[in-house]
Design a protein with these regions (language model features):
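A glycine- and Lys/Arg-enriched "phosphate-lid" helix/loop adjacent to the NTP-binding pocket
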Residues: 85-133
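Loop/turn-to-beta-strand initiation segments
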Residues: 61-68, 88-90
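Conserved nucleotide-sensing/catalytic segment adjacent to the nucleotide-binding pocket
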Residues: 4-65
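Substrate-engagement module of ASCE P-loop NTPases
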Residues: 51-63, 120, 124-131, 135
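Conserved nucleotide-binding/hydrolysis micro-motifs of P-loop NTPases
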Residues: 1-2, 72-75, 95-102, 152-154
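N-terminal regions of ATP-driven nucleic-acid and macromolecular assemblies
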Residues: 12, 23-28, 121, 128-132, ...
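NTP-dependent small-molecule kinase module
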Residues: 133-177
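Short, surface-exposed basic-aromatic patches at helix termini and helix-loop junctions that form
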Residues: 79-87, 161-165
């Protein structure tokens, strides 16, 4: 979306999710740091959700499989899916609940991907932590599967188990085997 929409039209779209607040109107400068971070994220997610919903609706219409992932895929997106569909929707959120572990993961990511500098994330760590805390609370309220991503192998196993259980439950409900 960033390549299609000029920064002058939607400046919050051209920021990272954890600092989209910097593009919010000036009257929000007086909000607390944590509220600004969350408000900026939600403004940005509102914009991204338009495209995500279009992709989702097209996949439903064309009956194709779709994996939609990212920090902007909020629990509310599920409400945009008609109940008159055969779609199997599995919502999962990953979280790292240990601050030191998340910092280590940022450092490791920067070693494996030259374009993802750890310092950028570490400098904004408090905002990232606040945002993750808020997203995990939203997920808990929406009764989504929350998978702790402290260990890659364990997280992958839990994701696969969650998918498998959801497929099994769907098949039992629809009488398929």
């Amino acid at each position: 979306m960033r390549t299609m929409v000029a920064v002058q039209l939607m400046p919050e779209l051209h920021e990272s999710s954890f600092n989209a607040w910097k593009a919010l109107p000036k009257h929000q400068e007086h909000a607390s740091g944590s509220k600004r971070v969350i408000d900026g994220y939600h403004r940005q997610a509102d914009l991204v959700e338009v495209a995500a919903e279009a992709v989702l609706q097209r996949a439903l219409r064309e009956n194709v499989s779709l994996l939609l992932e990212g920090v902007h895929v909020r629990p509310s997106l599920i409400n945009k899916i008609s109940h008159n569909t055969n779609a199997i929707v599995i919502q999962i959120i990953l979280g790292v609940t240990n601050k030191k572990q998340l910092q280590r993961q940022f450092q490791g990511r920067s070693k494996s991907s030259q374009n993802r500098r750890a310092d950028r994330y570490l400098e904004s760590f408090d905002a990232i932590w606040e945002l993750q805390t808020s997203l995990l609370a939203e997920a808990k309220t929406a009764n989504l599967s929350i998978i702790i991503n402290d260990n890659l192998i364990d997280a992958l196993a839990m994701i696969m188990r969650s998918i498998s259980n959801s497929l099994r439950d769907h098949n039992l409900k629809t009488g398929q085997s």
